[in-house]
Every structure is written in structure tokens, then in C-alpha cells.
Amino acid sequence: MRPGLPSYLIVLAVCLLSHLLSSRYGAEAISEPLDKAFHLLLNTYGRPIRFLRENTTQCTYNSSLRNSTVVRENAISFNFFQSYNQYYVFHMPRCLFAGPLAEQFLNQVDLTETLERYQQRLNTYALVSKDLASYRSFSQQLKAQDSLGEQPTTVPPPIDLSIPHVWMPPQTTPHGWTESHTTSGLHRPHFNQTCILFDGHDLLFSTVTPCLHQGFYLIDELRYVKITLTEDFFVVTVSIDDDTPMLLIFGHLPRVLFKAPYQRDNFILRQTEKHELLVLVKKDQLNRHSYLKDPDFLDAALDFNYLDLSALLRNSFHRYAVDVLKSGRCQMLDRRTVEMAFAYALALFAAARQEEAGAQVSVPRALDRQAALLQIQEFMITCLSQTPPRTTLLLYPTAVDLAKRALWTPNQITDITSLVRLVYILSKQNQQHLIPQWALRQIADFALKLHKTHLASFLSAFARQELYLMGSLVHSMLVHTTERREIFIVETGLCSLAELSHFTQLLAHPHHEYLSDLYTPCSSSGRRDHSLERLTRLFPDATVPTTVPAALSILSTMQPSTLETFPDLFCLPLGESFSALTVSEHVSYVVTNQYLIKGISYPVSTTVVGQSLIITQTDSQTKCELTRNMHTTHSITAALNISLENCAFCQSALLEYDDTQGVINIMYMHDSDDVLFALDPYNEVVVSSPRTHYLMLLKNGTVLEVTDVVVDATDSRLLMMSVYALSAIIGIYLLYRMLKTC
């Protein structure tokens, strides 16, 4: 018997005893023998170990031979050969080896392993002190808290922007409702599985615990990142091929038990006041995970109070995610994506720890935190998962219950920003049927307010944050199509060349606090015609900055993989160049350079030879049908003047195109004020040029040429205003005469 095994069995027995006393199994003995000869039979790696009911052996004692009982009724003796006629004898309670937990442990230990194989196993896995040499400890104080306090939104609105208040229909307040709630269980996902963790692992004993799994499969079954979350710790599994994956285990780890000869200290890479990080990776895999040797690996996740959820999201996850997105590393497994996955798992872990604080939290703050958790989950799926994704969505029943109650209780959500987050939570938790039409109507009105605010200015960080959430709503719901179509056209109209140019300039800045800073409406809009080739054609004399490819890469990553939530657009091939415009409740337009979709088409004739532009009008109630053939066509009428009476030109799109380059800009005009703004020569939206033309795509399905249009602003509305003003003047004059007479 090789040296060290007796000590190992003693340690094993102590572990078994402690687990038996603390587990739900308890200590128990088998009441009946397995057969007539043996008391216990264990299968260890397919080789049975039999414990005899009765057996004797001879040993030398004071120069005399005597028999010694090896197996007794209440104990099992282990005799280990030391030298000729010398044994180490250990007596252990039989009940330690007779219960289900004992079988679970012993079946994971190969007691028949040869010395050569044992020595090979010693050199298989990397040890931190020997192979990584990058151990670090952090001494910061850890406390569950929220550094944003009661701030209702992560990014606050500009001081000069008035946030609309929410109007709610009269409802009955549920009994027992209070304005503030404890954080207990609020951000804790539902642990819907009982997992056998580390089953069959070379180094670890398996453990049974409530948990949840979330996998992100990049290309195939061999390349993935998997998150396993338990009550006390989480595991990040990184697989690059079919070999043993790397494990990052973080948290409170007394239940993570190592097999001999390894000990926990051999694998501790990072250590904080309350938690440890273990890394288990084979030596021959270190070349693929060389970042484990970097002394600053995971510093941005662990060198502050990471139990502060808001600080964790800002300082850690968003920092890593921004780096991944800007560098185009989505769908790759390297240091950046591994750190991002770890920060995501740490956010889930910290969110579940919020209940430890036992503090009260307002409804708007709770909604913002929960929406932030769901938003980073959505980004993880977008960035890492293949298409279509196979990732299991996490469920938050307590947060959903809070959202439902707040939705039907007056005065609980007063600002539109809180309503946006509430609806976002319900939509991402498969609760679309609970979202009322009045809620989405107000969100669409908020989108229109942002549209008007930024007609002549670049988007603020706050606007990008809100449009990010609303853009996701558009593509994740099937209900309330009218309101979703309105939000969709707002995002499409905001995706201009000016916005794309400004967005590329933003990417040149080295620091971005949140992912929403890198959001552009182009990501959620109907514009699918931006490409590096097209931008190069539009600006042939300009040097394309390095941030332009990064911007287009971000668009490619963040854009939805389908338009299936819109029945009249779902069949559009997203790999082709087009613009989809949902200008009104019933009418959509698709702008392409070839016939692509069935409908009423308006071919544009004022383009050079070799260039084509086709505008196809579809009905929102008609199922999308792909076609490459010419179909029903109408001619485009030139309009010489526009009247604003009856708002006939409201809910339309102004399309700017070039004879040689095709579509340049698209602007959404919701009401008469937008039309006046667009056609006012002082705003330089419509600029006279021999090669540039302007079309207006109307809500009634008509397309007009408006390059030389004149706006008739003397409509009945302005006339009535003049009449009212004149009447007021006359009234004041008559009142003056009466007072003077008196």
C-alpha cells in the first residue's frame, strides 16, 4: 500500500462523518446484509470492494502469534502494510460506510489506482503556486448595498428634459401594499433544478445542491460558456474543445471538497474577505488560458465592494462588456469574454445577496435594478450565443410579482422611465399578456418626445439608455403592434448619417460607463443598409476612421436576428440591404435596390444607369411574402406645394437619395411641426442639389416627389389662430372703452 493512503482514509472518514451529521441522510447502517458473505459491496470505477462480515488474520505480538478480527459488528478495521509483520490498523464506525452519502463518496475514489497513475494525476492539473504564480488577495469591506440610493434610473436625465408622468386608469389598491419593499428575494432567480455538481471530475467530489444552469453556446457543442449558480457559490465553465473544460469557482466554498492528494489551497487564485476563487485547469490547456497568469486578471470585478450591485454593474460588467463590444470579441473565447462572463455570474450572485441587507427599496429603484439584470442577460445572449440562441432564460418570480402589483396600483410608478422598466421586465419574463395597451401607448409617446428633442441635436446618454430598452421591447413582444410600430419608426428615423457619424466619434472616447453609451437607434431600427462599402461610396474623399469598422461591427452584433414580431416584414432577408419603415398603423414601406417583397412598388426613375431604387408599400395586416419578380407598380407623383391642413402629411417619412449612391437619409415626420421643421430652408434638411432628390412616403400608401415643394402654412389652423388673436384684441379694446366711459 503506497504511503499517504492511511492518512487519506482518515480524512475521508472525517469528511463522511461531518457530512452525515450535517446532511439530510444522517448516519445509518444497512439492516440486512447484501448477501450471505458480505456486509457491504461498493462499485469503484467498475471494480467492486467487498467488506467481509467476519475475517481474521495473524500478527506477531510480543514474539507470539495471535488472531485479530478485522471486521466487527460495529466497526471496520483497515490494516495497512508497513513492513514484514507490521501493519497500521484503523478502526472506523461501520455506519460511515453504509449510507447513500458514503456510497456517493467512495464510488468517486479509485482505491485500486496504481502508483504510476497516481503520480500522473499529480501532474495533470495546474497549481496556482507552481504554474500560475498570480495569486492575489483583496481586503476591501464587503457589504450588500446600492450606491445609487433611490435614483430611479441608472443614467439620470438631463436637467432641462422634463420626464412625462404616468397616467394610470383607476384601479383598486391591493391589500397590504406599501410604497417600499424589502429586498428579500427580489433579485433572486428561481432555482428550478437539483444539480449534481462536479460529477466525475478528477479533482472534486460531487455535491448535490439546488442550482440553475445557463449556457451560452458560441458555435457548436464544444465551444461554450456555462454559468452554474447555487446558494453559496457559482461556477463558470469554459470549454474550447472536447477536452476537460476550465472551471472558475467563486463564493463560499466549504462544500467544494477535493480528492487526495490535492487541497483547496493549491487552486486558490483570488481571495476576498468573504469569498474565494478556485481555478481548475489542466496544464496542457494553459496555452489557451494564458490570461490566468496575468496579475490583473479579474481585478475590475473583485477590487471593490462587489456586493454593491449598482457599482458592480458599472465598474465590472459594463466595463468588460464595452471592451468586448468595441474590440469585436463577441463569439470568441479569450480573456475579455471570460472576464465578462465571470462579471455576469458575479452580478447574479451579488443580486441574490441583496436580501442580506434587509433594507427597504422603492419601487422605481427595484424596477431599475431588475431591468438592469435582465438587460445584461440579454446582452450575454446577443454577444455569446449562436443564432438561434439556446440559452435558458432566468426567471425572477418575486420581481415579476412586484411589477404586476405596481402596474395596477395607483401612485407607485409616477415617471415614464419606471413604466418603461416595468414593461421591459414583464416582456423579458414571458408575461406579455399582462402588459396593458395604455402602458405601451405612453411608452410610444415617450419615444416620440425623445424623437422631437433630438431632431436637431445628438442623442444624450439618457436618451440612448431609454431607446435601448424600448428598442428591445419592439422586438420581444407580439402584442400592441400599433404602439410597437410607432417606436420602430422613431428608432429608424433617428438612425441618420449624422447619428452614425456621431456614434463613430463616441467610440473614439476611451471611457464608457455603460453599454447603453454604445447604443445607437440604428441597432434596433429598420435601417439595414449601412455598410463600410456604402459609407466609402458616400464619402470617397474622406479617410474612414478606424472607429467606423468598429461601429459597423457593433451594429452587426446588436441588431435583432429577425423581424418576426412584424407580420408584414418578417420574411425580409436580414443579410441584404434594405430599409423598413412602419410609418403608420396600417402602412409600411421597404426601400431596396431590387424587388424583394410583395406589395405595391414605386420604382424611382431619377437614378443613373446601373443604379436602381425601389420603394414597396405593404399593408401591416398582410403576411410578408418574399419575391424577386416585378409586381404591381405605381408611378411617383411630383408635389409642388404641401398644405398642412388636416395633417395629411403627418406620419410620413422623408427620404433623401442621390442619383448615384442611393438612399442617404430617412427622417420620420410625426406631425405638422415635424413637417415644417423638415421643409424649413433654415434647417437645411432639404437642400437643393442637382443630384439629390427627396421623396415623401405618406401614411395613405402614396409616394410623392418633394424636391421642389413649397409649404403652404396658411392652413385653417393658422387662420383660426389669427381669428382668435384678432377677436382678443377687439375684446380688449371694447373693455377699455367701457371702463373709460364709466
UniProtKB/Swiss-Prot annotation:
Q: Where is this region: Interaction with gL?
A: 217-280
Is Membrane found in the keyword set?
yes
Output the Gene Ontology cellular-component terms: host cell endosome membrane; host cell plasma membrane; membrane; viral envelope; virion membrane
Give the GO biological process terms.
entry receptor-mediated virion attachment to host cell; fusion of virus membrane with host plasma membrane; symbiont entry into host cell
Q: Which residues are glycosylated?
A: 55, 62, 67, 192, 641, 700
Where found in the cell?
Virion membrane; Host cell membrane; Host endosome membrane
Q: What membrane topology does the UniProt entry give?
A: Single-pass type I membrane protein
Signal peptide (residue range): 1-29
Mostly located where?
A: virion
Q: Which UniProt keywords apply?
A: Fusion of virus membrane with host cell membrane, Fusion of virus membrane with host membrane, Glycoprotein, Host cell membrane, Host endosome, Host membrane, Host-virus interaction, Membrane, Sialic acid, Signal, Transmembrane, Transmembrane helix, Viral attachment to host cell, Viral attachment to host entry receptor, Viral envelope protein, Viral penetration into host cytoplasm, Virion, Virus entry into host cell
For the Virion surface compartment, the record's topological domain ranges are 30-719
| Post-translational modification (record) | N-glycosylated, O-glycosylated, and sialylated.
Is Glycoprotein a UniProt keyword of this protein?
yes
Q: Where are the transmembrane segments?
A: 720-740
Question: Which Pfam families does UniProt cross-reference here?
Answer: Herpes_glycoH_C, Herpes_glycop_H
Topology Intravirion: residue spans:
741-742
- Which InterPro entries does its entry note? Herpes_gH, Herpes_glycoH_C, Herpes_glycoH_C_sf
Its job = The heterodimer glycoprotein H-glycoprotein L is required for the fusion of viral and plasma membranes leading to virus entry into the host cell. Following initial binding to host receptor, membrane fusion is mediated by the fusion machinery composed of gB and the heterodimer gH/gL. May also be involved in the fusion between the virion envelope and the outer nuclear membrane during virion morphogenesis. In human cytomegalovirus, forms two distincts complexes to mediate viral entry, a trimer and a pentamer at the surface of the virion envelope.
Quaternary state and interactors: Interacts with glycoprotein L (gL); this interaction is necessary for the correct processing and cell surface expression of gH. The heterodimer gH/gL seems to interact with gB trimers during fusion. Forms the envelope pentamer complex (PC) composed of gH, gL, UL128, UL130, and UL131A. The pentamer interacts with host NRP2. Forms the envelope trimer complex composed of gH, gL, and gO. The trimer interacts with host PDGFRA. The trimer also interacts with host EPHA2.
Give the similarity note: Belongs to the herpesviridae glycoprotein H family.
The name of this protein is: Envelope glycoprotein H
Organism of origin is Human cytomegalovirus (strain Towne)
